[in-house]
Amino acid sequence: ATLEMTKKELNKLQKQNEKARHRIIGLTLETRPDWINRRAILAMREMGTTRIELGVQNTNDKILTLIKRGHDTKEIKRATKMLKNYGFKVDYHLMPQLPGSTPATDLKMMLKVFDDPDYRPDMIKIYPCTVVKNSELYDWLKRGEYKTYSDRQLINMLKKFKARVPRYVRISRLIRDIPGHHIQAGNKMTNLRQVIQAEMKKEGLKCNCLRCREVGHQHTESKVQSLKSKVRLFVDKYEASGGTEYFISF
């Protein structure tokens, strides 16, 4: 398939997919909150899109202005509600360590995503800010106007966050995998999630996100052999974007 695919060709492929032995069961598109409108939503729905990833980055308007993001938190809330009303799964991209942030304010910001019912996405991806050359942030770094956290500060903050996430959310990614030689400042650990999980286990902490509770990850990462005797049904009821959500899981 190419970007030049016509509507007729797309419809044909969608019909073929319905009877294929190995079917595509989901389609994800990434965009910005301020690009979400009825026309865009109808086009994405026609393409068969099931999930939208939103570049939220932060829920503090002062920081969004400082980094010249081009949208505010009102746009985030509006887009989130609109997408949910049209039946899409919503995945937020969150970026701790942005200019103007501290580990404490980042923790507060990310917890607000679940404390405030106008947010509450289905999934999140956490991308700690890193600095590469030929960027405005690199110029800030050289002038001493921006400084990243230490690895220890970042790990400690993310441990506190993971220990408090609700059961209905999936943390589907914890870093953006950028080659280390390109990174001028910021996290370079490609296994950051594993480092955090190992420390949490030693400290008796647990992440209840959907990914961490999946049987496959329990078996391969936590070496759990059998969960049959521990299986329980959970129904999480919560308010989100003016509606009531029920998340059912085991």
State where each predicted segment sits:
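Intrinsically disordered low-complexity regions specifically enriched for long asparagine
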Residues: 93, 124, 171, 227-229
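Conserved non-cysteine loop/helix-boundary elements of the Radical SAM core domain that shape
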Residues: 1-89, 95-152, 156
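C-terminal accessory regions of radical SAM enzymes
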Residues: 145-220, 229-250
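Intrinsic disorder/low-complexity segments
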Residues: 2-5, 219-228
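Low-complexity, compositionally biased segments
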Residues: 33, 37, 180, 220-222
